C-alpha cells in the first residue's frame, strides 16, 4: 500500500534585510525596529522573516562576501537598548554620528555613516565598561570563552584597522599567523581587542533576544550565509 506524504502547512514570508528597517538610527537594528517588525509580521499572519546574511559586509556593502562567517555586522547594534540597560550613557548615545539622521527604510543606506556610528558606539562601550558590575563581566567572559572563532576574528579586525590594508600587506610574522609574534602584539593592544569583543557580545545578545521574540510570536527566521568568506579575512 502506497504511503502518501502528509501535506505541509503553507505559510507566507517576507524578505527584508535588517538594514532596511526604519528607526531612530542610521541603519536598521536589533532593537525596537526589529521588535516592531516582528509584531507587524505576526499581526498580518506572516510566518517567515527571511534575511540576508548578518555577517559584516565587504567594502561595497555586500553581506555575501564577508571577512567572517561567524561575526555579526556592527551596524545592527541598537544604541537605545544599550543606553536603557546602562551599557552606555544617554549623553554618549546622543553624541553618536547620525543621531539626527534616522533611517526611513526608503532612502539609500549611508555605509560610511553607519560605520562611523558603530565605531563610535564601540568606543562608548569600552569607555563605560569599567563601571559595569561583576555579573555582566562574568557573562561577557563566559561568552568569550565559548566562541572558538572570536580571538582570530578580533585579532584580524584590529590588525586590519592598524595597517589599513589586506592581510597580505601586513608584517610577515603577523600575516603568516606566527604564534609568538601574535602573542607579543596582542599583549600590547588592550582596549582595542576588548572593543571588538564587546561589539560581538552585545550583537549576539541583541540578536538572541530577537530570535526569542520571533519564536514567541511564531515567526520563523529564514536566514542566509555568505557565498564565500573574503580572501581578505
Feature locations, PLM:
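Acidic/aromatic-lined carbohydrate-recognition and catalytic surfaces
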Residues: 2-233
Amino acid at each position: 500500500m502506497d504511503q502518501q506524504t502528509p501535506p505541509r502547512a503553507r505559510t507566507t514570508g517576507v524578505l527584508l534585510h535588517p538594514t532596511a528597517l526604519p528607526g531612530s538610527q542610521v541603519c536598521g537594528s536589533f532593537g525596537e525596529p526589529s521588535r516592531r517588525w516582528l509584531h507587524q509580521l505576526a499581526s498580518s499572519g506572516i510566518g517567515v522573516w527571511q534575511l540576508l546574511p548578518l555577517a559584516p559586509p565587504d567594502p561595497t556593502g555586500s553581506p555575501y562576501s564577508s571577512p567572517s562567517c561567524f561575526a555579526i555586522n556592527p551596524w545592527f547594534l541598537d544604541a537605545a537598548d544599550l543606553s536603557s540597560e546602562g551599557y552606555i550613557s544617554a549623553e554618549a548615545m546622543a553624541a553618536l554620528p547620525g543621531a539626527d539622521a534616522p533611517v526611513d527604510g526608503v532612502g539609500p543606506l549611508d555605509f560610511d555613516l553607519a560605520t562611523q556610528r558603530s565605531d563610535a558606539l564601540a568606543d562608548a562601550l569600552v569607555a563605560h565598561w569599567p563601571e559595569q558590575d561583576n555579573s555582566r563581566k562574568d557573562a561577557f567572559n563566559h561568552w568569550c570563552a565559548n566562541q572558538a572563532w572570536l580571538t582570530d576574528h578580533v585579532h584580524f579586525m584590529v590588525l586590519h584597522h592598524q595597517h589599513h590594508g589586506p592581510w597580505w600587506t601586513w608584517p610577515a610574522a603577523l600575516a603568516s599567523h606566527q604564534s609568538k609574534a601574535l602573542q607579543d602584539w596582542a599583549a600590547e593592544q588592550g582596549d582595542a581587542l576588548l572593543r571588538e569583543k564587546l561589539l560581538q557580545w552585545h550583537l549576539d545578545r541583541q540578536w538572541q533576544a530577537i530570535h526569542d521574540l520571533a519564536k514567541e510570536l511564531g515567526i520563523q527566521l529564514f536566514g542566509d550565509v555568505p557565498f564565500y568568506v573574503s580572501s581578505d579575512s
